[in-house]
UniProtKB/Swiss-Prot annotation:
GO terms for molecular function: rRNA binding; structural constituent of ribosome. Keywords: Ribonucleoprotein, Ribosomal protein, RNA-binding, rRNA-binding. Residues 21-31, 42-52 have a biased composition (Gly residues). Belongs to the universal ribosomal protein uL15 family. One of its GO terms (cellular component) is cytosolic large ribosomal subunit. It comes from Desulfosudis oleivorans (strain DSM 6200 / JCM 39069 / Hxd3). InterPro entries: Ribosomal_uL15 (IPR030878), Ribosomal_uL15/eL18 (IPR021131), Ribosomal_uL15/eL18_sf (IPR036227), Ribosomal_uL15_bac-type (IPR005749), Ribosomal_uL15_CS (IPR001196). Gene3D superfamilies: 3.100.10.10. HAMAP family: Ribosomal_uL15. Binds to the 23S rRNA. PANTHER family: 50S RIBOSOMAL PROTEIN L15, LARGE RIBOSOMAL SUBUNIT PROTEIN UL15M. Transmembrane segments: none annotated. This is Large ribosomal subunit protein uL15.
Length: 147
């Protein structure tokens, strides 16, 4: 056995069904499509989701909700995520994107209070929770709310 004479394991492959190749093949004439009718024709067959004229499922179910076109996409950053920054550094949108904490285009950044921090940082974000503000200021840092 070498690369020049490989063959599949016995029983692992199945011969393809050759349609419309004479009556002796068992799949000649109509090629397994039956006699006449919509599905026997070229391009025949119903569209996906068609249920034979019955009211389809996607129309039987009620509509729900809407998309608010004025919604703001606010990225969330927690205090514990700020451990990636050195003491005394300025943490703003650019710095957060550089560290991979904020991805893509966002309308604002909100700092939340999950976790702890032991050294001072200057944080510039558009929104901040009360607990996050207390923790940053307790560590000797400063919060600057930008719009």
């Amino acid at each position: 056995m070498d690369l020049s004479n490989l063959s599949p394991a016995p029983g692992s492959t199945k011969a393809r069904k050759r349609l419309g190749r004479g009556p002796g093949s068992g799949n000649g004439t109509t090629a397994g499509r039956g006699n006449k009718g919509h599905n026997s024709r070229s391009g025949g067959g119903v569209r996906p989701g068609f249920e034979g004229g019955q009211m389809p499922l996607h129309r039987r179910l009620p509509k729900r909700g809407f998309v608010n076109i004025f919604a703001k996409d606010i990225a969330v950053v927690n205090i514990r995520d700020l451990a990636r920054f050195e003491s005394g550094s300025v943490v703003d949108g650019e710095a957060l994107k550089a560290k991979g904490l904020v991805k893509g285009r966002v309308d604002g950044i909100k700092l939340l209070g999950k976790g702890d921090i032991a050294y001072p940082l200057t944080v510039k974000v558009s929104h901040v929770s009360r607990s996050a503000r207390e923790k940053i200021e307790a560590a000797g840092g400063a919060i600057e709310v930008i719009s």
